[in-house]
Amino acid sequence: MIYLWVGVAGFIGAAMRYGVGAAFYNADAFFPFSTLSANLIGSFLLAWFTIGLVQHRQLPESLKTAIGTGLIGSFTTFSTLSVETVMLFERGSTAAGVLYVLLSISGGLFTANLGYALGGRKKTE
């Protein structure tokens, strides 16, 4: 049954990823901003989910796996980042390729840290 939940959540995450890609797509952009946006949002969400929902609330393992691996895992796109970076270098856009990788890694760490910090806050009651 877990495969079904991961698959359903993965379908939703992939559809969300497509929506972000369509919303942020710009053919004239210096580098692929749509992929960067999806990966930064996904880094934040996975960290927030991991600390905020998993550690502070009782959730079934199947739901944790479906959301973390299925939904958020299909939303983020490391393979697309890799291919787009190679394409930037191949067409001679070295500065854009380097900037894209640096922003992806540093931005991902920053948004993951932010999600972790916000998810770890205890609610005042």
Predicted region positions:
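Membrane-interface helix-loop junctions in multi-pass transporters/channels
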Residues: M1-E125
